[in-house]
Amino acid sequence: MEQGQDTPWTQSTEHTNIQKRGSGQQTQRLEHPNSTRLMDHYLRIMSPVGMHKQIVYWKQWLSLKNPTQESLKTRVLKRWKLFNKQEWIN
Protein backbone atom coordinates (compact mmCIF):
# COMPACT_ATOMS: atom_id res chain seq x y z
CA MET A 1 0.00 0.00 0.00
CA GLU A 2 1.34 3.42 -0.87
CA GLN A 3 1.88 6.02 1.79
CA GLY A 4 -0.90 8.55 2.14
CA GLN A 5 -3.52 5.97 1.27
CA ASP A 6 -4.01 4.53 4.73
CA THR A 7 -7.35 2.92 5.29
CA PRO A 8 -9.16 3.52 8.58
CA TRP A 9 -8.00 0.03 9.55
CA THR A 10 -4.28 0.78 9.07
CA GLN A 11 -4.67 4.15 10.79
CA SER A 12 -6.25 2.53 13.85
CA THR A 13 -3.52 -0.13 13.82
CA GLU A 14 -0.82 2.52 13.76
CA HIS A 15 -2.54 4.35 16.59
CA THR A 16 -2.57 1.15 18.65
CA ASN A 17 1.11 0.56 17.95
CA ILE A 18 1.99 4.12 18.99
CA GLN A 19 0.01 3.73 22.22
CA LYS A 20 1.81 0.48 23.00
CA ARG A 21 5.21 2.06 22.33
CA GLY A 22 4.34 5.00 24.57
CA SER A 23 3.37 2.78 27.48
CA GLY A 24 6.56 0.73 27.17
CA GLN A 25 4.84 -2.49 26.13
CA GLN A 26 5.99 -4.68 23.28
CA THR A 27 4.93 -3.34 19.90
CA GLN A 28 3.19 -5.65 17.50
CA ARG A 29 1.30 -5.13 14.27
CA LEU A 30 -2.31 -6.18 14.67
CA GLU A 31 -4.04 -8.26 12.05
CA HIS A 32 -7.75 -8.30 11.36
CA PRO A 33 -9.55 -9.20 14.59
CA ASN A 34 -10.76 -12.74 14.95
CA SER A 35 -12.95 -14.19 17.68
CA THR A 36 -9.98 -14.77 20.00
CA ARG A 37 -8.74 -11.17 19.73
CA LEU A 38 -12.23 -9.80 20.25
CA MET A 39 -12.62 -12.05 23.27
CA ASP A 40 -9.31 -10.82 24.68
CA HIS A 41 -10.45 -7.23 24.18
CA TYR A 42 -13.71 -7.75 26.07
CA LEU A 43 -11.96 -9.66 28.85
CA ARG A 44 -9.64 -6.68 29.38
CA ILE A 45 -12.47 -4.17 29.72
CA MET A 46 -14.89 -6.22 31.84
CA SER A 47 -15.09 -6.57 35.61
CA PRO A 48 -13.70 -9.82 37.11
CA VAL A 49 -17.18 -11.20 37.90
CA GLY A 50 -18.56 -10.29 34.49
CA MET A 51 -15.38 -11.63 32.93
CA HIS A 52 -15.83 -15.05 34.57
CA LYS A 53 -19.43 -15.29 33.39
CA GLN A 54 -18.40 -14.32 29.87
CA ILE A 55 -15.52 -16.83 29.77
CA VAL A 56 -17.89 -19.63 30.73
CA TYR A 57 -20.38 -18.50 28.10
CA TRP A 58 -17.77 -18.22 25.33
CA LYS A 59 -16.29 -21.62 26.14
CA GLN A 60 -19.73 -23.17 25.80
CA TRP A 61 -20.38 -21.22 22.60
CA LEU A 62 -17.06 -22.24 21.01
CA SER A 63 -17.61 -25.88 22.00
CA LEU A 64 -20.66 -26.07 19.73
CA LYS A 65 -19.56 -27.67 16.47
CA ASN A 66 -22.58 -27.41 14.16
CA PRO A 67 -25.38 -25.89 16.18
CA THR A 68 -28.86 -25.78 14.76
CA GLN A 69 -30.95 -22.69 15.25
CA GLU A 70 -33.26 -24.55 17.64
CA SER A 71 -30.40 -25.88 19.80
CA LEU A 72 -28.94 -22.37 20.04
CA LYS A 73 -32.31 -20.94 21.01
CA THR A 74 -32.73 -23.55 23.75
CA ARG A 75 -29.20 -22.98 25.03
CA VAL A 76 -29.57 -19.21 25.12
CA LEU A 77 -32.90 -19.42 26.96
CA LYS A 78 -31.40 -21.76 29.56
CA ARG A 79 -28.42 -19.46 30.08
CA TRP A 80 -30.69 -16.43 30.35
CA LYS A 81 -32.90 -18.07 33.00
CA LEU A 82 -29.88 -19.23 34.97
CA PHE A 83 -28.26 -15.79 34.75
CA ASN A 84 -31.45 -14.09 35.99
CA LYS A 85 -31.72 -16.49 38.94
CA GLN A 86 -28.14 -15.71 39.95
CA GLU A 87 -28.79 -11.98 39.69
CA TRP A 88 -31.77 -12.26 42.05
CA ILE A 89 -29.75 -14.33 44.55
CA ASN A 90 -26.89 -11.83 44.54
UniProtKB/Swiss-Prot annotation:
It is found in: Host mitochondrion inner membrane; Host nucleus; Host cytoplasm, Host cytosol. Keywords: Apoptosis, Host cytoplasm, Host membrane, Host mitochondrion, Host mitochondrion inner membrane, Host nucleus, Host-virus interaction, Inhibition of host innate immune response by virus, Inhibition of host MAVS by virus, Inhibition of host RLR pathway by virus, Membrane, Modulation of host cell apoptosis by virus, Viral immunoevasion. One of its GO terms (biological process) is symbiont-mediated perturbation of host apoptosis. Pfam families: PB1-F2 (PF11986). Residues 1-34 are annotated as: Disordered. Its main location: host cell. Is not encoded in all strains, and seems to be dispensable for replication. HAMAP family: INFV_PB1F2. Belongs to the influenza viruses PB1-F2 family. Plays an important role in promoting lung pathology in both primary viral infection and secondary bacterial infection. Promotes alteration of mitochondrial morphology, dissipation of mitochondrial membrane potential, and cell death. Alternatively, inhibits the production of interferon in the infected cell at the level of host mitochondrial antiviral signaling MAVS. Its level of expression differs greatly depending on which cell type is infected, in a manner that is independent of the levels of expression of other viral proteins. Monocytic cells are more affected than epithelial cells. Oligomer. Interacts with human SLC25A6/ANT3 and VDAC1. Interacts with host MAVS. This is Protein PB1-F2. It comes from Influenza A virus (strain A/Chicken/Shantou/4231/2003 H5N1 genotype V). The gene is PB1.
